[in-house]
Amino acid sequence: MNQPNAESIVRRATAAFNSGRPDEARELCEKGLARTPGEPMLHHLLAAVLFSKNEIQPARKHVETSLARKPGNAAAHLLAARIARAAGDFDAALLHLDRAITIKPQRDAFLEKARTLDQSGQRPLAREAWRAILDVVPQHREAAARFGRLAWEDGDHTAAAAYLERAAVTDAPASVWFDLGLVRQDLRDYDKATAAYRKALDKKPDYAEAALNLGIVLQEAGDLDSAMRAYREAYRLRPQAFGKIAMALTSASHGRLWIDEAALRRSLGG
């Protein structure tokens, strides 16, 4: 019986991987590499399978082997960049991305570069990269969310609000609604900030920081009873937030002076 060739194994392994059977895909790749060591397609696919299982270092080894055997593969450079970013090796990730973009400019590579610049703390370059994506795809939600967050960190609240409102659609993650709450809070739009923080908590009920900030904006809006309920939830989720809650209660324009720390803890349910 004829042994399956590498392309046949890749097709079967890819089908298994895409059907949610990564262990089968891994076994096929490993058997294929036992027959044809160094086959770049199999190393590439095995790297993708391992990466999906968060086996970062083995995945990195296989994708680098694939590139050594078949230089100039844009898809392999993109995968190598993602794996390097996951490993925290941002310089290597950016090097792979620049090579991928040179070989075959495509949206996924530019998006991955923006993520890498952002995660590595290169804020001016990250903001520029996210903005470039928005220039081409104005409704790109991730780009709008990250550009908005960076604009807020730079003190550009007007731009931050505009882009975060674009990103804050029904299925947006809790982090986007939280960031929108921060911007609206800084703009002293407490009603909209309240709505954003509530949405963040709807998405992620254990979001202690959102509960804390919800308490602060409710307090600023003069609704101290609702603020206390939010503070109780924040304290329940994260008892370490007690100091921030106490500070907020005594420093805001609508607050209460708590001289007895134990009494405040009891009021918060502690």
Predicted regions: what they are:
Residues E7, M41, A75, D108-A109, ...:
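Start-of-helix register in tetratricopeptide repeats
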Residues T14, A48, R82, R115, ...:
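Residue-level recognition of tetratricopeptide repeat
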Residues F17, F51, L78, R85, ...:
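Position-specific recognition of the canonical hydrophobic site in helix A of tetratricopeptide repeat
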Residues R35, R69, T102-I103, V136, ...:
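Structural marker of alpha-solenoid helical repeat scaffolds
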Residues L45, L79, E112, R146, ...:
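Canonical tetratricopeptide repeat
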